[in-house]
């Protein structure tokens, strides 16, 4: 049970590098589309961050929560999980083409992508590479999306690839408005992310 939690928590919180902003989206809601485009452009320039927070997951036969540390440096990531997940901790590191998951007292698992690691270990298919975009409050650029804007021209909700993402609150950090509380709803799976500390970076300059 602990290993199942660890793999899901690790892969729900990640990353396969940052690309250009070319999402195909339908926009509705209260916000101004022009301000939304400016907001997207600003956030898309972030290619590094450090996050501290909490993550929870609920499935028909499985649920749990834990603390999250996520370091992103362009296409490299280091994600660590601990807390009330079980009797250990986990660390997920890698870059495109090479992913390593280390679980205390459980073992070491390798794959070429976070999606394939999740598929191999649990038999689940999740668009985990979208999270590098969703965590910044952006739709992933490689598939169609339906976007609803709030009154500040930021994401209120997002529908993409069978997932519904709700943005419950934002926080301002270093001039960037970034998600603070996010809920993700998929088929038979709900994920809640609460970010306690955002440290955004622009590394590619």
Swiss-Prot record:
CDD domains: LolB. GO terms for biological process: lipoprotein localization to outer membrane; protein transport. PROSITE patterns: PROKAR_LIPOPROTEIN. Residues 1-17 form the signal peptide. A lipid is attached at residue 18 (N-palmitoyl cysteine). Keywords: Cell outer membrane, Chaperone, Lipoprotein, Membrane, Palmitate, Protein transport, Signal, Transport. A lipid is attached at residue 18 (S-diacylglycerol cysteine). InterPro entries: LolA/LolB/LppX (IPR029046), OM_lipoprot_LolB (IPR004565). GO terms for cellular component: cell outer membrane. It is found in: Cell outer membrane. The keyword Signal applies. Its main location: membrane. It is a lipid-anchor. It holds the Pfam family LolB. Monomer. Plays a critical role in the incorporation of lipoproteins in the outer membrane after they are released by the LolA protein. HAMAP family: LolB. Belongs to the LolB family. This is Outer-membrane lipoprotein LolB. It comes from Pseudomonas syringae pv. syringae (strain B728a). The lineage of its organism: Bacteria, Pseudomonadati, Pseudomonadota, Gammaproteobacteria, Pseudomonadales.
């Amino acid at each position: 049970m602990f290993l199942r939690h660890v793999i899901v928590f690790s892969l729900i919180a990640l990353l396969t590098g940052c690309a250009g902003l070319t999402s195909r989206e339908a926009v509705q809601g209260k916000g101004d589309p022009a301000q939304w485009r400016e907001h997207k452009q600003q956030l898309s320039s972030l290619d590094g961050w450090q996050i501290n927070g909490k993550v929870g997951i609920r499935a028909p036969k499985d649920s749990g929560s834990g603390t999250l540390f996520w370091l992103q440096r362009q296409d490299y990531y280091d994600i660590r999980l601990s807390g009330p997940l079980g009797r250990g901790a986990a660390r997920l590191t890698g870059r495109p083409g090479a992913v390593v998951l280390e679980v205390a007292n459980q073992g070491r698992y390798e794959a070429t992508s976070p999606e394939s690691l999740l598929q191999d270990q649990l038999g689940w298919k999740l668009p985990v590479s979208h999270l590098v975009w969703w965590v910044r409050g952006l739709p992933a650029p490689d598939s169609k999306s339906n976007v609803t804007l709030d009154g500040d021209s930021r994401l209120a909700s997002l529908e993409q690839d069978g997932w519904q993402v709700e943005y419950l609150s934002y926080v301002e950090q270093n001039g960037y408005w970034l998600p603070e509380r996010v809920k993700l709803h998929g088929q038979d799976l709900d994920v809640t992310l609460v970010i306690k500390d955002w440290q955004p970076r622009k590394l590619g300059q």
